[in-house]
Amino acid sequence: MKRKWWHDKVVYQIYPKSFYDSNGDGIGDIPGIISKLDYLKELGADILWLSPIYKSPLADQGYDIADYYSIDPRFGTMEDMDRLIAEAKKREMYILMDLVVNHCSDEHEWFQQAIKDPDGKYGNFFYIRDKKDDKAPCNWRSYFGGPVWEELPGHPDKQYLHVFHKKQPDLNWENPEVREEVYKNIRWWMEKGLGGFRIDAIINIKKKLPFSDYPADRADGLCSVGRMLEEAEGIGEFLGEMAEKCFYPYDAFTVGEVFNEKEDEIKDFIGENGYFSSMFDFEETCYGKSEDGWYASKPYLTPEEYKKCIFHTQKKIGDTGMISNIIENHDEPRGVCHYISPEDRCPDSRKLLAGVYFLLKGIPFIYQGQEIGMENMEFTSMDQIDDISTIDEYQVALRAGCSEKEALDAASAFSRDNARTPVQWSAEKNAGFSEGEPWLGVNPNYKEINIESQLTDSDSLLSFYKKLTALRKAPEYKETLVYGTFAPYQEEQKNLIAYTRNGEKNLLILGNMQAQSQKVSLPGEVKEVLLNNQKAVEITEKEIILKPYQFIVLETAD
């Protein structure tokens, strides 16, 4: 594997609206991020990925962009952005922005021009079709529910495609003018000093044309747009062109949001000269999710299910490229709630989860608040929810026959707003996030779970994350933890998540994800205990006895 500057880095994702509010308007902002750079550096973060801060009506929290060259005034100014890039650079940190180019906002100038003249230049920037017999061109269902077709404003005989929200019209990537506009913008931002991009929903840019129906998969007579993506061919032409024209010349770090990639395509996506530097491992986030909706999905994974997912990805990727490992992000419930059952949730199991994912082969991502174990919000009413996807899933559950309480429980378990509640900085008013009224409710547990209290507690989850980042960066272990091989260890032993990382050193990572102790045989002599989430360790010549929820990293002779 050709070595790149980002391979040994730790990435921290910031959802700016909920990170830190510097001016008391209830919305996090760029100056707020700048004020916390030293905290992030101390945590061990090298790269900061910002969710969208472009000018936007925020129909989908900034993933509907009205101007790719402007900062939304709610987040600050372009001068603030320049200062953030400069201040990060002083600390040897890099900034990634979200690249959202499957679609734009319906308030973008391109779409406004398309409304004025659907048959003109900008009409071809989108997928605009004539209505025929009052029927849509196809029966695809959008990711946020309902058909993907919407009437073009002022043109009752025409409709446009949106695979997400109706305020997010899809860009026509078949049009080379669209692609050149996208590439021009990417280069503009790279010239400003970005380290690269996280690339949103990019797998959707290639549609299977002409538009056609699929068998309905729900009672609404529609079929998930994902069904079309399974058959769409030729996306590599677009992604390869973008990499050649925009990413390679700048040695940019890029992370693709890619779902359902085929095993024989991994090399194309993240191998040598791949479309992206990396892509996320979504196997565990998708596991147990039902096509019928959240109400029919598993609210949390068992240890064996989680192990099966992460091990499958590690084996599949191998030495082909660098996967990006996550346990949560802005679109998912909180990791400690999704990967640890309620009865197993305790300080040690939270550290175990952190350690198990963080030391896998690949690039570790930390989402804001994850480092202190922020939890899902216990929503008591849909009035507390802002997320458009959650509102749709609530209605899906009701239509399926769920009671209002059952539908709300499903929303609480999976809502994207779980990860979007304000960061809990302290036990002060509004969790120290803002002097004003926060745009989204603060989790009531902020007095027990907050950064300020964990900063001074050497046994806190935050302190454990610092130990993890320090271990990964330690000169004597970095080579092994970044480039060393991965292999499952005692894979059949129930509720044991264990693997080796072998290279210059031989490391054994062990996690006992159960309330009972269990014995684990050792591969050879233990040279050193590198990390332990408990004070004691019980090792004999041939085995180790792991206490309930114990996580330990050993350097072994073999």
Predicted features by range, described:
Residues 56-60, 103-110, 205-209, 262-266, ...:
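Short catalytic/ligand-binding loop motif for oxyanion handling, primarily in non-cytosolic enzymes
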Residues 517-534:
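Beta-strand-rich binding/interaction modules
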Residues 540-558:
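C-terminal beta-strand-rich structural cap/linker in extracellular carbohydrate-active enzymes
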Residues 48, 197-199:
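Hydrophobic residues within beta-strands of alpha/beta enzymes
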Residues 6-7, 214-219, 227, 237-249, ...:
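Loop/helix patches that line or flank the sugar-binding groove of alpha-linked glycan CAZymes
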Residues 2-187, 191, 204-262, 269-271, ...:
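Acidic/aromatic-lined carbohydrate-recognition and catalytic surfaces
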